[in-house]
A protein has these predicted regions:
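Active-site HxH/HxHxD metal-binding segment of metal-dependent hydrolases
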Residues: 1-79
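Conserved S/T- and glycine-rich ATP-binding loop of Class I adenylate-forming
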Residues: 24, 87, 213
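Aromatic/hydrophobic pocket-lining residues that form the small-molecule binding cavity
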Residues: 31, 125, 206
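Short, solvent-exposed loop/turn segments at secondary-structure boundaries
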Residues: 57-60, 116-120, 197-200
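Metallo-beta-lactamase
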Residues: 81-170
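C-terminal regulatory/interaction regions
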Residues: 173-230
Length: 230
């Protein structure tokens, strides 16, 4: 349905020339229908190098996929420049796009408009958030949720960093209280009002934090239990 909507509005605009199709990452809700869109707009697909092979298999002509370089500038037909920022964490192949001239950050799934995102590697994710923080932006355009305007947009990335660090401290507190299993740690740090459908995501987020704490040398895993290092 989204593919049809995109193509509908593209035609309503008079089918303007598209210079590049920019991909944030390779999750299905971000690349579904790419073959149909590319066939209509006849533009090359730009993405993270680790995603290029996968996207090449989706298209009739793999040569249409051109990997981006970290920090590469993409210039549109209107001479507007976007900068590709490699931001792993939510996914290993994630890219955000920075429009410096308008102080806009297109964050994909790295920063959402009304909630926190799922994270594959928390260390990478926090590094990516700290990278984004270095780029002056007033507006955040996420892939999910509302656009966040100034002044909130400028603070959103830092809020996400503080949110993750708060969760980490809550998990350490739970371990200090003797909680050892992911489900019971999740019960401790998430509100009882958590919707049932969000429970699996909450447990995955707890597990991601625990994996980071292991890498940091702060905890160790014994079978399926976790405890603080002595």
């Amino acid at each position: 349905e989204w593919t049809r909507s995109i193509l509908k509005y593209y035609r309503l605009l008079g089918s303007p020339k598209i210079t590049s199709i920019l991909i944030t990452h390779g999750h299905t809700d971000h690349i579904g229908g790419l073959d149909r869109i590319q066939e209509e707009v006849q533009a090359p697909v730009r993405c993270h190098p680790k995603l290029a092979n996968k996207l090449g298999k989706l298209l009739s002509c793999p040569e249409l996929v051109i990997p981006l370089r970290s920090d590469e500038f993409i210039t549109t037909g209107g001479r507007i420049k976007l900068q590709a920022l490699f931001t792993p964490g939510h996914e290993i192949d994630h890219i955000c796009y920075y429009l410096e001239s308008d102080s806009v950050m297109f964050t994909g799934d790295t920063v959402l408009g009304a909630s926190s995102t799922s994270v594959r590697d928390l260390t990478d994710y926090l590094n990516s958030l700290n990278l984004l923080k270095n780029y002056k932006h007033e507006i955040v355009c996420p892939a999910h949720g509302p656009v966040v305007l100034a002044p909130q947009g400028a603070d959103l990335v830092n809020w996400q960093i503080q949110h993750r660090l708060k969760r980490e401290n809550q998990i350490i507190e739970a371990l200090n209280k003797g909680l050892r299993q992911v489900p019971e740690i999740t019960d401790h740090i998430y509100p009882t009002t958590l919707k049932q459908g969000l429970r699996p995501s909450a447990e995955r987020n707890v597990m991601t934090h625990l994996e980071k704490l292991i890498k940091d040398g702060k905890i160790k895993k014994i079978t399926s239990k976790f405890e603080l290092q002595s």
